């Protein structure tokens, strides 16, 4: 068509038909908004969207999940997407509730029809997209096998729950993680503070070889160790660095591992 060839404009009826086919709005079809959201490879999915008109703080309570992705994107809406390859009752058993309260947005994931948190931990994948220009402080409560936080630039992110693996990439923030599980934390890139609060846990934090940071431990009987090429080494933190890693809690250990190039 002339539209595809760049020599004309599309008929609105055709646009509406195409948008309906792909289950997106005409505005999204004409913009690049969807290009930042990878299309799902899952069999079952559910999406909830909400328009935002200004900067907001976010209080997100998800309960159990197999994996959670929290990421910023260039758009106008917050979107909560749920996926599963085995949970065919996804649409009926899980509902996202979004409340807009002045300068705060509350996001709650509610379970119905006796859907259990155990089921969610085995099969439920959640991705939350937040518009870059509207991101305030974020509080996230979740029990998940993996958590990925990507491209978020804000003042503070607080994560509470039971989490086994965390990956941080492209963020500029003060990130606080409160989890009493032994965690594997991977920092691919991050600017700012990373504060880890644990009770009787041993976690490993892997950082790039060229990542400069200063570190400190607080609390009671906490220890930070350092590892390079599979061997324990002396403290290689930099007291003059801007990036900051802190371990707090009781009877906990953090091993900071320099990734092999």
Model-predicted segments: where are they?
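Right-handed parallel beta-helix
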Residues: 49-53, 57, 89-172, 184, ...
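Short acidic/polar N-terminal linker immediately downstream of export determinants
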Residues: 32-89, 117-122, 225, 229-240
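Generic detector of contiguous secondary-structure segments
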Residues: 8-15, 88-99, 200-211
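Active-site alpha-helical segments that house and flank conserved acidic catalytic motifs
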Residues: 60-62, 140, 215-217
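A generic structural signal for short beta-strands and their flanking turns/coil linkers
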Residues: 76, 122-124, 192, 213
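Recognition helix of helix-turn-helix/homeodomain-like DNA-binding domains
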Residues: 1-9, 32-34
């Amino acid at each position: 068509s002339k539209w595809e060839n760049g020599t004309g404009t599309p008929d609105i009826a055709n646009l509406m038909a195409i948008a309906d086919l792909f289950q997106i709005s005409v505005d999204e079809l004409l913009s690049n908004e969807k290009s930042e959201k990878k299309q799902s490879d899952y069999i079952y999915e559910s999406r909830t969207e909400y328009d935002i008109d200004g900067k907001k703080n976010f209080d997100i309570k998800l309960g159990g999940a197999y994996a959670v992705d929290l990421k910023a994107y260039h758009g106008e809406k917050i979107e909560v997407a749920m996926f599963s390859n085995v949970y065919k009752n996804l649409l009926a058993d899980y509902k996202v509730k979004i409340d807009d309260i002045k300068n705060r947005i509350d996001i709650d994931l509610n379970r119905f029809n006796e859907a259990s948190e155990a089921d969610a931990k085995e099969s439920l994948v959640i991705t939350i997209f937040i518009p870059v220009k509207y991101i305030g402080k974020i509080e996230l409560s979740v029990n998940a096998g993996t958590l990925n936080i990507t491209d978020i630039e804000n003042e503070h992110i607080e994560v509470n729950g039971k989490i086994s693996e965390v990956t941080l990439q492209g963020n500029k923030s003060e990130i606080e993680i409160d989890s009493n599980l032994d965690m594997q934390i991977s920092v691919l890139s991050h600017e700012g503070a990373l504060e880890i609060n644990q009770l009787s846990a041993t976690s490993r934090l892997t950082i790039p070889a060229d990542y400069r940071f200063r570190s400190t431990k607080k609390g009671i009987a906490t220890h930070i160790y350092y590892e390079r090429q599979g061997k324990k080494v002396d403290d290689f933190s930099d007291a003059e660095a801007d990036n900051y890693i802190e371990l707090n809690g009781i009877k906990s250990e953090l091993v900071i591992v320099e990734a092999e190039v």
